C-alpha cells in the first residue's frame, strides 16, 4: 500500500507535465501500471483471475 501522503502529493497539480505519473487506483502503487485499466500488474492479475475485468481472459498456448 502506498503512503497516503504520497497519494495526496501525486494528486496535486505538478509544476511541469513530465513530473506527472500514473498510480494504481486500487492500491496506489506507482510502478507497472497498465494505463488502459488504471491498475498495477498485481491488482490486474487478481481481478482478471476473479473475472471482474470484462474482456480479459487467461491466455493459453
Curated annotation (Swiss-Prot):
GO terms for biological process: translation. GO terms for molecular function: rRNA binding; structural constituent of ribosome; zinc ion binding. Keywords: Metal-binding, Ribonucleoprotein, Ribosomal protein, RNA-binding, rRNA-binding, Zinc. The keyword Ribosomal protein applies. Binds 1 zinc ion per subunit. Part of the 30S ribosomal subunit. Contacts proteins S3 and S10. Belongs to the universal ribosomal protein uS14 family. Zinc-binding uS14 subfamily. Binds 16S rRNA, required for the assembly of 30S particles and may also be responsible for determining the conformation of the 16S rRNA at the A site. This is Small ribosomal subunit protein uS14B. It comes from Oceanobacillus iheyensis (strain DSM 14371 / CIP 107618 / JCM 11309 / KCTC 3954 / HTE831). The lineage of its organism: Bacteria, Bacillati, Bacillota, Bacilli, Bacillales.
Amino acid at each position: 500500500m502506498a503512503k497516503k501522503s504520497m497519494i495526496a502529493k501525486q494528486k496535486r497539480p505538478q509544476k511541469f507535465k513530465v513530473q506527472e505519473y500514473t498510480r494504481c487506483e486500487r492500491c496506489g502503487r506507482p510502478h507497472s501500471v497498465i494505463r488502459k485499466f488504471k491498475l498495477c500488474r498485481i491488482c490486474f492479475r487478481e481481478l482478471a483471475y476473479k473475472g471482474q475485468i470484462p474482456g480479459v481472459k487467461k491466455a493459453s498456448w
